[in-house]
Structure formats: structure tokens, C-alpha cells
Amino acid sequence: MIDSATLTYAPFVDSRGKHNPDFTTGQSGKLLIGTDANGKKYLIKHCYPHNAANEFVGCWLAKKLDIPAPNAFLLSPNKAFQSRFAVAIEFLDLKPFDKKAVSHPDDLIAQFVLAALIAQEDRIQLKVVDNHIVSFDFSESFCISKLDLILGLIRQHTSFAQDCAVGILRQQLSAFQKSLTRVKFNHPAFAQAYNLDCEEMCKTATAISKRVLRIAENEIRFMSEELEKLFPMEISVYYEECIFAMQEHIKSFQ
């Protein structure tokens, strides 16, 4: 976790809106740019709690699977934020991605695998950094919604409210587990769109997905402990169970 007091903040201006009067901000709400004492910049998502949790865990998982992605850090609460829950995402020098000239097809396939595993709901956003294809924006993932409601129930500290919160989390975990059963890597249309051999793409995607099995339980617990610096234990357990569900499902892959 980063101490939010060590950063200075300014509004983030999306370049896509400069020449498009109809452009609107995404589901994450208004963003900030955070800058540390050394000049390092971060994109700050601070409006909704599920954004912070999903971005942190999504980037953590990408790193564990050796998939190019920015680093992400939870932030301590700050009056500059619209909620108590914020995440600092490494601000990268992104270059446009040209699907007609894919120099690192394994990177592209890896991003497709990551999006499938985390049940990413938004369109996959691809850019290029240091000649590698990176993905970003994992805010709508892991089948977790209603997090404001869940956190509100947990804060009530009554057995009824706790049971309601856990019940909602169990429903969402069930939805995530079902999403894993729909994961498949034999997509001829995707392969054709990016000039990939479908059979080779499927083999590569399967091999990348099996990297999930390398993640040790103590590494998952470390991720969970980071979450617990900001979120209640019930939320960290949810993400632990998501990773365990991935591992259990991937074991069945040939």
C-alpha cells in the first residue's frame, strides 16, 4: 500500500475527449493523476470500491502469470478521493496497438487469457509499451458488484447483516465459478482477426493459463493481506476463493 499523503493530485484529462465533444468518462468515474516526490506518475481510481480491488488483484495476477500489465498499489484513504477505496495504477508511456502488425503474438494471446480468467466485462484495451502488448482497465472483473452494499452490511456489525453480506458474496463467487466453465481458447474468429494460427493460439493460451497453478498459497495470502489493509476480511477471502477456483478449473485443462 502507498501512503496517499506522499502523492500530489491533479485531474486526469483523457486525450480521447479533446477532439470529441460527445466523449464521456467511463464507469470508473472521474480519475486523478498522482505524482510522487520522484516524479513517478500513477492513474488514480477512487470513486468505487470494486474498482480499487479489481485493479489491484487483476494487475497482481497478471504479474504472477508473466503477462505484461502495469503495477497497481492500494492507497490509504485521502480527502481527495470520492471513496475510502482507491488504487494507484502505474502510468505507462502507452503507444497505439496495431492488430495488423502483432510483433509479440504471445503477449496478445496472454491478454486474451487474462481477460477470460478474470471474467473481464469491459472490452479488452490493448496498447504497446517497450514493444510488448499490455492490457489495462480491470475495473469490471471477477463478477463482483454491489460492493458498496456489501461493505455497508459488514459495517453494521450485526449477525443478520454479516449473513446477508456473506450470502451476496457467495452468489457472486458462484457466478465467477460459472464464468470459468465458459473459458475456452479455440476461437477461430479471434485467430483470424489477428492473423494467428488457431491451433497454435489454443496451445499457447492453454500453456499460459496453466501458470495459475504456479501461484503458491502463501503468495495468494500475501495478496489477501494487502487487500485487508483497506478492505474487510470478507472481501479478501472472496478474491482468494476466485484464485483457488481458477486453479481448480485449470487443472482440468489438457
Identify the meaning behind each predicted range:
Residues K95-L149:
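Conserved kinase catalytic-core segment
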Residues I44, A72, K99, K146, ...:
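Short acidic, gly/pro-rich beta-turn/loop elements at beta-sheet edges
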Residues K63-L65, P105-L108, L153-H157:
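Short, low-complexity, polar/charged sequence segments that are solvent-exposed and flexible
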Residues H132-Q254:
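C-terminal catalytic region of ATP-dependent kinase domains
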Residues H46-H50, A101-P105, F160-A161, F231:
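Conserved aromatic-histidine-acidic binding/catalytic patches
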Residues D3-P96, Q111-E121:
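Conserved ATP-binding subdomain of kinase catalytic cores across diverse folds
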Residues K79-F81, R123-L126, L169-F176:
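Low-complexity, flexible helical/coil segments
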